[in-house]
Amino acid sequence: DRICTGITSSNSPHVVKTATQGEVNVTGVIPLTTTPTKSHFANLKGTKTRGKLCPKCLNCTDLDVALGRPKCMGTIPSAKASILHEVKPVTSGCFPIMHDRTKXRQLPNLLRGYENIRLSTHNVINAETAPGGPYIVGTSGSCPNVTNGNGFFATMAWAVPKNNNNKTATNPLTVEVPFICTKGEDQITVWGFHSDDETQMVKLYGDSKPQKFTSSANGVTTHYVSQIGGFPNQAEDGGLPQSGRIVVDYMVQKSGKTGTITYQRGILLPQKVWCASGRSKVIKGSLPLIGEADCLHEKYGGLNKSKPYYTGEHAKAIGNCPIWVKTPLKLANGTKYRPPAKLLKER
């Protein structure tokens, strides 16, 4: 008797494409690809995954948390992976913000990209004695604090001239913003300015003309000129009653580097700053996070890796993910197909 290996006959051959012989019939294959179905997003196995910046801050958007809105302040858990669930973050209280004038919408997503995020325990500037003062720190009834009194964002101080002696127009003033974070962290410093109609500008600041503002840090300089009256509606902020508007921006200060802000009337001086370190991988997705998954995929949500490759929609993914391929892949685990002997004789 003779045993021949490598070729056999079968009634159910499979076709595989090979690099050297093109299409070849074989007796058995193992599928290497899967086509996922869309599912909910999940926590990434083996690591901490961040959904909302502050999970315990109820009724707060991520921008509320990033700006330090009263009643929206809490611990931001560390995370190696983060879900970008608000593509266009907005705030829903405190003061109408002219979102599209600056990069303020990007602030929550900037923070989300860090593994460790904390708010400083003390203020970076003494707002009451800053150049152009003395000032009182303005508050808003639409921004209640924890005792339901008038409040404002923890990251900024609304610097209103304290008395008639300094409630006048001023040439540009400059304040240095020191670096107060530690442990090699980046410092994210939030600042801004307030403007109103001409009547309110004179009442608050003694000057009804547009005001100029400049920030500079880490080689990046930004200039603004305030708008006086004629503001757009702020429907996305819930129709807040204030006649004025604020513009909010931020600057990133690297370890040990001082920043500067040059301003006129209506400045929102930086107060508490964000100290952030490490990197968190960010992917677009949705909440809530349900269960765990090997992989987070922007189009399919949470995936468990059942095969090494996948077909379907190609998109960003993080974790232990299958590799995208255009067409299904198969591994031949059988022998090369040989037609039955009877068929060979008929030829």
Curated annotation (Swiss-Prot):
Subunit text: Homotrimer of disulfide-linked HA1-HA2.
Function, as annotated: Binds to sialic acid-containing receptors on the cell surface, bringing about the attachment of the virus particle to the cell. Plays a major role in the determination of host range restriction and virulence. Class I viral fusion protein. Responsible for penetration of the virus into the cell cytoplasm by mediating the fusion of the membrane of the endocytosed virus particle with the endosomal membrane. Low pH in endosomes induce an irreversible conformational change in HA2, releasing the fusion hydrophobic peptide. Several trimers are required to form a competent fusion pore.
SUPFAM superfamilies assigned: Viral protein domain
One Pfam family recorded for the sequence: Hemagglutinin
Lipoprotein in keyword set: yes
Membrane topology: Single-pass type I membrane protein
Subcellular location: Virion membrane; Host apical cell membrane
Stated family: Belongs to the influenza viruses hemagglutinin family.
Protein name: Hemagglutinin
Post-translational modification note: In natural infection, inactive HA is matured into HA1 and HA2 outside the cell by one or more trypsin-like, arginine-specific endoprotease secreted by the bronchial epithelial cells. One identified protease that may be involved in this process is secreted in lungs by club cells.
Biological-process GO terms, alphabetical: fusion of virus membrane with host endosome membrane; fusion of virus membrane with host plasma membrane; symbiont entry into host cell; virion attachment to host cell
Sugar attachment sites: N25, N59, N145, N166, N304, N333
Keywords of this entry: Disulfide bond, Fusion of virus membrane with host endosomal membrane, Fusion of virus membrane with host membrane, Glycoprotein, Hemagglutinin, Host cell membrane, Host membrane, Host-virus interaction, Lipoprotein, Membrane, Palmitate, Transmembrane, Viral attachment to host cell, Viral envelope protein, Viral penetration into host cytoplasm, Virion, Virus entry into host cell
Disulfide feature: none
Cellular component GO terms, alphabetical: host cell plasma membrane; membrane; viral envelope; virion membrane
Annotated GO MF terms: host cell surface receptor binding
